[in-house]
């Protein structure tokens, strides 16, 4: 899951997968 934002990345990571 690619997100353009730190908060977005963390939020998506909860139900998508950690980007960092």
Swiss-Prot record:
What's the domain of life for this entry? Eukaryota
* Keywords (A to Z) from UniProt: IgA-binding protein, Lectin, Mannose-binding
Question: Which stretches are tagged as biased composition: Polar residues?
Answer: 1-10
Q: Does the keyword Chaperone apply?
A: no
One GO MF term attached to the UniProt entry = IgA binding
Query: Per the record, which residues fall in region Disordered?
Result: 1-20
Further comment? Two isoforms exist, a major form and a minor form. This is the major form.
Outline the subunit composition: Tetramer of four alpha chains associated with two or four beta chains.
Q: Which family does it belong to?
A: Belongs to the jacalin lectin family.
- Protein task: Alpha-methyl-D-mannoside and D-mannose specific lectin. Binds IgA.
Q: What is this protein called?
A: Agglutinin beta-2 chain isoform 1
Species: Morus nigra
């Amino acid at each position: 899951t690619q997100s353009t934002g730190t908060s977005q990345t963390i939020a998506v990571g909860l139900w998508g997968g950690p980007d960092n």
